[in-house]
């Protein structure tokens, strides 16, 4: 089968022989829906087959994957796959959360990487696309009581790096003040883990430059403009030396991007339109570089061309100042209220939809969720081809671009995937999550680590039922989105881990 884009260009075949789909051996970052489910959905939508580890060997929350099980999974499926998409965080540490802990020693990481290099060399004809993260600015928050140390570590990292650049005694004093708020053993482990992870990243760069890996995507997870991660990046950039096979950008949960990298054909095109501001010269929350740089690198990684004449539009909506409210730490009642900006942005989206453009909407007025004041004024959200607003800006971007590429190759729109983003990114993250957290705390539960996840999930479903029944004045600003989902089919929501940060949303066919 030969696929063609809208311009008629020949695209990579999705079938090796008649009736036999392209097979991708996929090792996700971890078991969360964004890393496990999203890539599988977008691969299967465009006719590919996703081969992934079975649940019984995979990580779950703080429990890392079974190394021997993962190794056996790769051995059993390497030959049948046409291309491999591998997360080094998963392979070498057992999950993203485990990559921030000392559960795996540096020597064990070296042994696992050496095994994989030898194993990969048994299949030199297989393209191998690799993803790995540069350790975030701070530690994991596995319970509410971790937040104090989390913020102190962020400040310690920020001011330490800034002081090394500016030489300012004031900056160094701030670093020392922050360090005094952190237990000594936590600081020692933090630096040990950073050293181990940086070693792995440097080694992955070397393997890519030697041609062992076909491409390497190094992702900077939650960060600031300054921090120990910046010093590590400077070393890595020097090692990379403009090698086109290696990309550094903000993000972490870029499974959809990695999945589509495996299948991307000759370049496809889209038109970038900034809504609410004239450009992307702002640093999104929890990122360390201008967002337009992350957009450019994501497009280059996938081979997407920015063509102003394209009828496919990547609409990036953000406020004029580029300042994002974090919907995780903000109560729903205090979400931003810029009525003029919301209406102007919605009017522009309405114009594009009325003119027949295929609009993929990246809603970045907020971080960790969409902005209902904006989306409620979109007259026909059912006409949107895609929507994304979850987590950080680069996470949301990767998800949207993954769907866009998959839709282009399939020649049809994955509206079920879009609706699941409405359920998750907008309805849950911008509204229900904060209410759920408030209720759980009132009953003595910690949203960061639930003691009774079954009860939390029951309350989650009840809140969605209230929303879809339009019970309460707060539900009215979601009426247009709820209508779209109701018209399409039934839905299901659940908590994949024992915390409320993410939800797993499904819309049934």
Identify what each model region corresponds to.
Residues 19-509:
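An N-terminal assembly and electron-transfer interface module characteristic of large anaerobic redox
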Residues 4-21:
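Short, Lys/Arg-enriched N-terminal segments with co-localized hydrophobic residues
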Residues 1:
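A small-molecule sensor/coupling module
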């Amino acid at each position: 089968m030969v696929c063609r884009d809208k311009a008629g260009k020949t695209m990579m075949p999705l079938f090796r022989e008649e009736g036999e789909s392209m097979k991708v051996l996929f090792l996700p970052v971890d078991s969360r829906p964004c890393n496990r489910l999203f890539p599988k959905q977008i691969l299967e939508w465009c006719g590919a087959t996703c081969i992934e580890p079975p649940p019984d060997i995979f990580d779950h929350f703080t429990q890392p994957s079974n190394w021997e099980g993962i190794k056996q999974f790769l051995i059993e499926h390497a030959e049948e796959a046409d291309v491999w998409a591998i997360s080094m965080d998963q392979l070498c540490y057992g999950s993203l959360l485990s990559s921030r802990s000392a559960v795996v020693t540096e020597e064990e990481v070296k042994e696992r990487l050496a095994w994989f290099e030898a194993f990969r060399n048994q299949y030199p004809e297989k393209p191998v696309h690799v993803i790995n993260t540069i350790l975030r600015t701070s530690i994991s928050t596995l319970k509410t009581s971790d937040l104090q140390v989390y913020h102190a570590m962020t400040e310690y990292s920020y001011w330490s790096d800034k002081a090394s650049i500016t030489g300012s005694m004031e900056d160094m004093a701030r670093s020392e003040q922050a360090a005094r708020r952190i237990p000594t053993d936590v600081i020692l482990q933090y630096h040990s883990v950073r050293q181990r992870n940086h070693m792995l990243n440097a080694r992955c760069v070397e393997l890519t430059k030697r041609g062992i890996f076909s491409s390497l995507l190094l992702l900077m997870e939650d960060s600031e403009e300054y921090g120990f991660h910046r010093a590590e990046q400077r070393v890595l950039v020097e090692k990379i030396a403009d090698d086109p096979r290696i990309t550094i950008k903000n993000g972490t949960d870029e499974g959809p991007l990695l999945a589509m990298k495996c299948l991307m054909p000759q370049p496809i095109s889209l038109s970038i339109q900034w809504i609410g501001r004239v450009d992307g010269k702002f640093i999104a929350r929890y990122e360390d570089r201008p967002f337009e740089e992350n957009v450019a690198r994501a497009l280059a990684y996938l081979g997407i061309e920015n063509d102003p004449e394209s009828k496919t539009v990547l609409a990036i909506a953000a406020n004029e100042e580029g300042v994002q409210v974090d919907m995780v730490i903000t109560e729903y009642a205090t979400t931003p209220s810029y009525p003029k900006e919301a209406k102007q942005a919605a009017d522009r989206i309405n114009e594009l939809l009325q003119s027949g453009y295929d609009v993929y909407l990246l809603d970045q007025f907020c971080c960790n969720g969409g902005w209902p004041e904006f989306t409620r004024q979109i007259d026909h959200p059912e006409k949107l081809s895609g929507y994304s607003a979850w987590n950080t800006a680069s996470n949301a971007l990767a998800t949207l671009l993954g769907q866009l590429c998959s839709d282009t190759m399939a020649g049809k729109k994955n509206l079920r995937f879009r609706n699941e983003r409405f359920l998750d990114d907008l309805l849950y993250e911008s509204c229900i999550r904060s209410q759920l957290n408030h209720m759980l705390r009132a009953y003595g539960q910690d949203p960061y680590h639930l003691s009774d996840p079954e009860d939390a999930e029951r309350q989650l479903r009840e809140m969605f039922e209230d929303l879809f029944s339009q019970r309460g004045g707060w539900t009215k600003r979601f009426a247009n989105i709820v209508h779209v989902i109701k018209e399409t089919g039934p839905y299901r929501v659940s908590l994949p881990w024992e915390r409320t940060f993410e939800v797993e949303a499904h819309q049934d066919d």
